[in-house]
Amino acid sequence: MQEILLKSKIHMAKVTDKSINYMGSIGIDVELLEKSNIKPYELVLVADVNNGQRFVTYTIPEEKGSRKIVVNGAAARLVEQGDRVIIMAFGMYENDEYKGPRVLIMNEDNEVVEIREGT
């Protein structure tokens, strides 16, 4: 039986900007997308640690090395610049094929300080 399980997580990233008039999405530095195994345009759940808001959107790539996390569209009303967020992507797995998620632990400057596999 297939189950929906956590595939990837970017933990405690800092929102660097927001744009209410953009057509939706969350922009993420392409380097972070690659390291986290989250694809451009993939569906993600975002949790704002500062205010408890959660929303579903999709990713778009930001410039590699920019460390940008940009919330766009209506969801931009749910965050503030400087908020810390958890970005989660899920996948469908058979129990015997699931090895656990890849988790990027971020610092205040949106630098990866640790990568955890299968935890």
UniProtKB/Swiss-Prot annotation:
Active site: 25 (schiff-base intermediate with substrate), 58 (proton donor)
Binding site for substrate: 57, 73-75
Superkingdom field: Bacteria
PTM annotation: Is synthesized initially as an inactive proenzyme, which is activated by self-cleavage at a specific serine bond to produce a beta-subunit with a hydroxyl group at its C-terminus and an alpha-subunit with a pyruvoyl group at its N-terminus.
Entry note: cofactor: Binds 1 pyruvoyl group covalently per subunit.
GO BP, one annotated term: pantothenate biosynthetic process
Catalytic activity: L-aspartate + H(+) = beta-alanine + CO2
Chief location of this protein within or outside the cell: cytoplasm
Family: Belongs to the PanD family.
Role according to the record: Catalyzes the pyruvoyl-dependent decarboxylation of aspartate to produce beta-alanine.
Record protein name field: Aspartate 1-decarboxylase
Source species: Thermosipho melanesiensis (strain DSM 12029 / CIP 104789 / BI429)
Gene assigned in the entry: panD
